[in-house]
Amino acid sequence: MTKIVRSKYKASRRLGVSLWGDGKDAFNTRNYRPGQHGRNTMVKTSDYGLHLKAKQRIKCHYGRITEKQFRNIFGFAQKMKGNTGENFIGLLESRLDSIVYRMNIAPTIFSSRQLISHGHIKVNGKKADIASMRLKEGDVIEIKEASRQMGIIQESVSKQGQTTPDYVSFDVDSLSGKYLRVPTISDVRYPFTPEVHLVVELYSR
């Protein structure tokens, strides 16, 4: 198991949820914090601690987003019309790495970023190698022709029982899909309950 994989599973245990719904996640068998005092359930979390944990869960779910990037996305969401929390999740889900992951082109958000940065993904017929690229409704995402037989891609798209969320479409035969619309919070299939309101409160202080 690589250092990154160990680190991400440790994050699930530290934050008390399975962050990606992965069957290999150590949280499934050891649902307590790592470390000497991990099983101690008597530790009381402060109000600030609850807000911070809510933020960390969502931030970790989207992979290696820095705190600066995460806060900047929130700042942009605040300036948009409508509900800040909904805007925030909509912006996070509109990122290219999020959509490649949601389309099941990549098995994890981490491998999604890697496929993009290595030039295996195209948007509207052009190579797209920036994971944070914000997609617009109607954008077409496809796997570069020369990359379509890659083992990680073939294994991911061929998994039985997989479905895509309603805000994307994906055709397994053509290995291409479309970003249909900006999702609401309830549209996103988080493996935990996202307490977005706590993140809004934290960043609005």
From Swiss-Prot:
Keyword RNA-binding: yes
Transmembrane segments: none
Keyword Ribosomal protein applies: yes
GO molecular function: rRNA binding; structural constituent of ribosome
GO annotation (BP), single: ribosomal small subunit biogenesis
Annotated SUPFAM superfamilies: Alpha-L RNA-binding motif
Keywords: Ribonucleoprotein, Ribosomal protein, RNA-binding, rRNA-binding
GO cellular component, one term: small ribosomal subunit
SMART domains attached to this UniProt entry: Ribosomal_S4, S4
Domain S4 RNA-binding: 94-172
Family designation: Belongs to the universal ribosomal protein uS4 family.
Free-text function comment from the UniProt entry: One of the primary rRNA binding proteins, it binds directly to 16S rRNA where it nucleates assembly of the body of the 30S subunit.
Subunit organization: Part of the 30S ribosomal subunit. Contacts protein S5. The interaction surface between S4 and S5 is involved in control of translational fidelity.
Annotated protein name in UniProt: Small ribosomal subunit protein uS4
Organism phylogeny: Bacteria, Pseudomonadati, Pseudomonadota, Alphaproteobacteria, Rickettsiales
Gene that produces this protein: rpsD
